[in-house]
């Protein structure tokens, strides 16, 4: 019998773990962290704090574009990193894709769209019931707008293409990267959520329903 879950998601910590995250253990089954866990390596001790929470719930992370190789190694040492990996929990396949598409800022963990596509397609192509944990948001959604007045989209076109091509199999895409684009959106059947640094989401797999809450209201 499938156990329904509550999945909580956060993103863009930049080395600071909101105190409320420790309370997630009281109700969450899985915590996903969508990258930029540190600020170019600063605040790396936050990874150990996340690892401590894995005694109470599954903790699944991907690195962001601002996370260095040292950060990735630290995530691996605590077995939290699901970048380009699959972690099956109950009937859901959690798939991670870390880093971002190219930015103007030459950050440590950026890739071409071709690289992103090749990294992700090889993981998702034979899977069903996928929960995608991505740092970069899919292109042309409410999750990737950098200037809310000018409607400029900067997300990954490869991630969007894969969501479109495997729309029946990808039920959810949790992402971050663009701090100002806090949203719940959809691409076809796929729920897309960017909680932004100031919020977290809770996804109820039984109801197939997601809500966003501010940390200051916890």
UniProtKB/Swiss-Prot annotation:
InterPro entries: Calcineurin-like_PHP_ApaH (IPR004843), Metallo-depent_PP-like (IPR029052), PAE1087_MPP (IPR041733). SUPFAM superfamilies: Metallo-dependent phosphatases. CDD domains: MPP_PAE1087. GO terms for molecular function: hydrolase activity. Pfam families: Metallophos (PF00149). It comes from the Archaea. This is Uncharacterized protein MJ1162. The lineage of its organism: Archaea, Methanobacteriati, Methanobacteriota, Methanomada group, Methanococci.
